[in-house]
Amino acid sequence: EKGWTPVHATVLYDQMKRISDYFLEQNFDFERDFFCSLYNEDFFQPKDPDDLQSWCGGVGNSMIACDPQGRIFPCIRYMESSLNGEQEPYSIGDVDNGIGCTECYKCRINCMAKIDRRTQSTDECFYCPIAAGCSNCSGYDYQVNGTPDSKATYICVMHKARALGNLYFWN
């Protein structure tokens, strides 16, 4: 989210190096001993341009949330309590009438159904050489950009630091 700087990325990389050294000194077996989500050999490489799957699950029907007023949202991040007053809540229905019961709700559902990695990404993001494993949240995209179909890129500097930390660890 907004606020990450190269200073934060440097701290993350330095800390990942320290913990990597510890893991390696202890000779931990990542297959059997434990799991640390910071390290993943499958991430930090280009994504196939044909892979259009969006990282975020909040653009479909897999993360439905409901507020106390009975409004239905694609995810909790679209609710008023998550938007920090930066956007209007992005509901797609209500408990009395169902999902997609108005033209506005239908329009929002159609918008989200069309979101994929290509539509939400700039060319720099889409063709990033370490795109695999880069996460995003369409609700946060909506909060800062006014649309769920425009990827916020504040996390880039931290993803790069994590990639460097993985390079250090795995090599």
Regions found by a protein language model. Give the residues of each.
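Flexible mid-to-C-terminal extensions adjoining Fe-S/redox cofactors in radical SAM and related proteins
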Residues: 80-171
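Radical SAM enzyme [4Fe-4S]-AdoMet core and its adjacent flexible, acidic
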Residues: 1-72, 79-90, 151
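Short glycine-/small-residue motifs
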Residues: 74-75, 136
